[in-house]
Design a protein with these regions (language model features):
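Alpha-helical transmembrane segments and their short interhelical loops
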Residues: 1-5
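Terminal transmembrane helical anchor/hairpin motif
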Residues: 9-79, 83, 88, 118-127
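Hydrophobic residues positioned within well-ordered beta-strands of beta-sheet architectures
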Residues: 141-145, 156-160, 173, 216-218, ...
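Beta-strand-rich interaction surfaces with strong enrichment in secreted/lumenal proteins
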Residues: 145-147, 160, 191-192, 203-208, ...
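Extended, low-hydrophobicity, Ser/Thr/Pro/Gly-biased non-transmembrane segments
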Residues: 219-323
Length: 323
């Protein structure tokens, strides 16, 4: 296209080298490889265990550049001044070329918007953390978890013993839970307790005097939103792809897995309710640990091996870990 446009071979080659250099060394890693026509900065590695970290976006990015290339190739045909071997419907070629360019830009726009949405949502979750950072909070003394997972849906029941170790009364109890997990009920004994939800924060309408303890049950169900993980790490730094040692491919990043084949959950994804936030985006090193006695019972493993910290014990209907 450049050559047919400029009609100068040397200048065309020079411009193409400059364009390739800009894409390769400057724009290749912008927006996680969106402007990389060669795909060198994309997660190309495929794991037999975890699969591909983002196959849909990967294919859309590659299709984006394929369509853009086809569009410019069509325009080059129209601008190439020579007698054709057979009659060419220039209008049809123009429509196809422009359509390819438009579709390519649309595919690229979708990839860009998805990445932009991830960053915006992470900023929203970080603002929520900062909003409630200075609120007085209780401490979870013990947490008894009953978890069942089917497909990409996680069902949990958490019995929390929360104590107010502050010198002042708590007007409400602050809890944290993954935003994709929907809380169906919070009960103190057999009594339902009112609560409000703001992203990953749960505000339980229960006063707690200094030194007072309360036990209530949180029932929840849903998926895992990985965008709430590691909010204390800069977005570009967190999603910067690293090459696999001894291999030309790069590996993508995932922070949780929930599926039929295997499930991997870490405390950072907030798959169970906690009273102290695991991160502090405003001051990453100012994080207070919450020392809690945990008991985890996993039901309906479907033959899969369950691995968790604590003492393992097989019980009727599931496997229990205490620690």
């Amino acid at each position: 296209f450049i050559h047919t446009w400029l009609r100068h071979r040397g200048l065309s080659i020079l411009i193409l080298l400059v364009v390739f250099g800009v894409f390769l060394f400057q724009l290749g890693k912008v927006r996680e490889g969106l402007f990389d026509p060669f795909g060198l900065s994309l997660p190309n590695a495929f794991s037999e265990v975890t699969g591909h970290p983002g196959m849909a976006l990967y294919l859309m990015q590659r299709v984006c550049w394929l369509l853009v290339g086809m569009g410019f190739a069509g325009l080059a045909v129209l601008m190439f001044q020579r007698l054709p071997n057979r009659p060419v419907n220039q209008k049809r070629v123009m429509i196809v070329a422009v359509s390819c360019l438009v579709l390519g830009v649309l595919f690229g726009g979708v990839v860009y918007m998805v990445r932009e949405n991830v960053e915006c949502v992470r900023e929203l979750y970080a603002e929520t953390y900062n909003k409630y950072q200075k609120f007085p909070k209780g401490n979870v003394i013990s947490n008894t978890l009953e978890v069942e997972q089917k497909g990409n849906v996680l069902s949990g029941k958490s019995t929390l013993l929360v104590k107010n170790q502050e010198d002042q009364e708590l007007s409400e109890i602050i809890l944290y839970l993954n935003p994709a997990l929907v809380v169906s009920a919070i009960k103190e004994g057999e009594t339902d307790v009112a609560f409000e939800r703001e992203n990953q924060v749960i505000r339980v309408a229960r006063r707690l005097l200094p030194g007072e303890e309360v036990e209530f049950t949180v029932e929840y169900r849903g998926g895992i939103d990985e965008r709430v993980c590691y909010l204390d790490v800069d977005f570009d730094k967190l999603f910067q792809l690293q090459p696999i040692p001894g291999h030309s491919s790069t590996a993508g990043k995932r922070f949780a897995f929930v599926g039929d084949d295997f499930t991997v959950l870490t405390p950072e994804c907030l798959w169970y309710p906690v009273a102290q936030p695991s991160v502090n985006p405003a001051s990453p090193y100012d994080v207070l640990p919450d020392f809690t006695s945990y008991s985890l019972q996993v039901a309906s493993t479907d033959g899969r091996t369950v691995i968790a910290p604590g003492k393992r014990e097989a019980k009727e209907g599931g496997i229990c870990f205490t620690g």
